[in-house]
Amino acid sequence: MLGNNYAPEFFNGCDPKASDPLKRICEETLEDLQGYKEVLQDFGVEVIQPEMDPNERFLDNPHRYPRGPLQPRDYQLVLGNTCFSSGCDHPAIIKKLQEYGEVTKPQYTVPVITSEEKYNFVSGADWPTWNDFVSNRKNQDFFEDFVWQEALELSSHEWMSSACCFMIGTKLFVGTSAISISQIKPEGTDMLGVDKFDVIFADMVGHSDGNYHPIKPGAILSLRDVQMYEETFPGWDVCYLPDQSWSKVKPFLNLKDKNAGKWWLAGEEDNDEFTNFVETWLGNWVGYVEETVFDVNVLMLDEHHCCVSNPNNAQVNAFLKKHKVEPVYVPWRHRYFWDGGLHCITLDLYREGTQKDYFG
């Protein structure tokens, strides 16, 4: 699956000082998506996309609008050829996935709630304290029956996002917080379907695919030493890019943070700060990102072809050549505006071949 986005007309009727630049971003995003789709098809990939309602308008919704169905990897997990979905994604993504094939709702064998903050938000008056939950979450007898059932239904984990996981042969690498690892002590047996794989948890800030990317057996692109590779990927060759991606766009990300909560919010389309934010992106950042920022959020088409949004990084190109991988340039101008790279905006649903143990 390749993501999709709102058409420029989605912002018809809004104040032009905000809607005009947003329309440009949407138009260029759709152009880049079409180019990406053609690249995928040229390599023999069957591509499906969420379908958009052409009559949908921003002003039709008086409340916060959901982001477009652009990043199908964020709330789905594909293991083998089984697609798990939390059901929290854009309705157009869920609908298209169900049309394509069976979508499986995750079933937890024990409650998994990964932080005290989330626990306090979802827990009822009859639930145990956070510390008692952490100590007893695998002991059903400790809980009232209805509390146990509620906790199972409200369970979630980073492994329910293919953006936080890498399925490499028979191993599933899951990026999660150090607090979650130390307090919850998650295990693959916590969820049906995951228990068939050797699950390895690694401390990670943000999505795994925005921090590092295994490009083929024995080779990894990485922004920094985000994990102890000698333990998780012993003997693999790692290309470190400590000054790329997020660190190169830090001033823009700071501006983006200031506008948190103003995304798709009715009444904010004429907000001067928001308008400045959008115009700053278009005026100062798009060309810079295209030309100088390398994003490890890449997509491997096969063992020898890697989709990249910046073909100009000499260090990366040398590393790819060393491992007999050819970069395939896919323009993706608004990656840091939408917060999704080439990997995030796709979701592998079916791959041929068999799973192997690459670490034996």
Regions found by a protein language model. Name each.
Residues 1-360:
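The feature marks the mature, well-folded catalytic cores of soluble enzymes
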